[in-house]
């Protein structure tokens, strides 16, 4: 089990229900087996440093967790499928 920090950005033009649904979908990936979410924080709507998919703002969500590497692969798969998430990054902490 390794420690990870995950940050993902959602499109700014989706509603609160869609934001909540997307956060729950991502959290469900890690709510099984031995994985543990240490902190999940919705940072809200922020300006982007540059335009991504014609958006200048994005809804940021940050997570700190202990997870198996297979769950990170599953996270990346779900993010690629979900059109509401415009960018994500996974950082493995040492």
Curated annotation (Swiss-Prot):
InterPro entries associated with the record: Ribosomal_bS6, Ribosomal_bS6_sf, Ribosomal_S6_plastid/chlpt, Transl_elong_EF1B/ribsomal_bS6
GO BP terms: translation
Keyword RNA-binding assigned: yes
Keywords (A to Z) from UniProt: Ribonucleoprotein, Ribosomal protein, RNA-binding, rRNA-binding
GO terms for MF: small ribosomal subunit rRNA binding; structural constituent of ribosome
This protein's GO CC annotations: cytoplasm; ribonucleoprotein complex; ribosome
Task of the protein: Binds together with bS18 to 16S ribosomal RNA.
Family label: Belongs to the bacterial ribosomal protein bS6 family.
Name of the protein this chain belongs to: Small ribosomal subunit protein bS6
């Amino acid at each position: 089990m390794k420690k990870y920090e995950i940050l993902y950005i959602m499109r700014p033009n989706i509603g609160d229900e869609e934001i909540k649904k997307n956060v729950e979908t991502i959290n469900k990936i890690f709510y099984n087996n031995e994985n543990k979410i240490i902190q999940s924080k919705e940072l809200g709507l922020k300006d982007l440093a540059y335009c991504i998919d014609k958006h200048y703002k994005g809804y940021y969500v940050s997570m700190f967790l202990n997870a198996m590497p297979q769950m990170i692969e599953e996270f990346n798969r779900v993010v690629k499928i979900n059109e509401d998430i415009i960018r994500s990054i996974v950082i493995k902490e040492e």
